[in-house]
């Protein structure tokens, strides 16, 4: 049974989410401020965190930033603010996805399922689920899918699940330009609720970790107005 940590200082909202998630078969633990969130995270080791942006004591952005120092657990951020700035900051600090309040149970369930599904290594297109995926070497970048590890110059990179999945998908289709919409559907696991800005932010975050000079990328390149691709001979 997958365990969800719900962090929201508004108890009615927390109770509704808990009820719906429990009904879907998840184990649920709750926290009502940032300090409790960090304590519950350490004690319960959840499979996914639903994290409100506005929290007392320690805000959601700081909670996400702290958790990301030691864990790549999927984080779904909730926000009453519908500003692009808050969404981008949340993603850059390590959140995997966001939902703007008010939201429907259907939307939240879809996002949680997508994050949990994508938090496990997936076979590349056409590969049998029970076969062992082979490592991919592109220049000085090595991707080991069965270990969920990426290395640069032999040193392991600190990637979140989402960043790894995006890198792995692009590396599995070197030279092929992939649209933001396709990446959103394939890597994030949904196409109806998503925002392509999420892809752009994650690509930028990934470049900062794998590129020697992120402003002049050698691995993940942009085809303006279309999408992204992994260079064949980076």
From Swiss-Prot:
A single GO cellular-component term on record: membrane
Keyword Phosphoprotein among record annotations: yes
Molecular functions per Gene Ontology: cis-regulatory region sequence-specific DNA binding; phosphorelay response regulator activity
Keyword check for Transcription regulation: yes
Keywords: Cytoplasm, DNA-binding, Phosphoprotein, Transcription, Transcription regulation, Two-component regulatory system
Modification note: Phosphorylated by WalK; can also be dephosphorylated by WalK.
DNA-binding region(s) in UniProt: 133-232
Pfam families given in the database record: Response_reg (PF00072), Trans_reg_C (PF00486)
InterPro entries: CheY-like_superfamily, OmpR/PhoB-type_DNA-bd, Resp_reg_WalR, Sig_transdc_resp-reg_C-effctor, Sig_transdc_resp-reg_receiver, WalR-like, WH-like_DNA-bd_sf
Subcellular location per the Swiss-Prot or TrEMBL entry: Cytoplasm
GO terms classed as biological process: fatty acid biosynthetic process; negative regulation of DNA-templated transcription
Domain Response regulatory: 3-116
Modified residues (4-aspartylphosphate): 52
Other remarks on this protein: Part of a walR-walK-walJ operon.
Subunit and partners: Monomer. Homodimer.
Function: Member of the two-component regulatory system WalK/WalR that regulates genes involved in cell wall metabolism. Binds to the promoter region of the transcription factor fabT gene in the fabTH-acp operon in vitro. Inhibits transcription of fabT, probably acting in an unphosphorylated form, thereby playing a role in the regulation of fatty acid biosynthesis. Essential for normal growth in vitro. Required for maintaining normal cellular morphology, acting, at least in part, by regulating peptidoglycan hydrolase pcsB.
PANTHER family per UniProt: PHOSPHATE REGULON TRANSCRIPTIONAL REGULATORY PROTEIN PHOB (PTHR48111:SF40), REGULATOR OF RPOS (PTHR48111)
Protein name: Transcriptional regulatory protein WalR
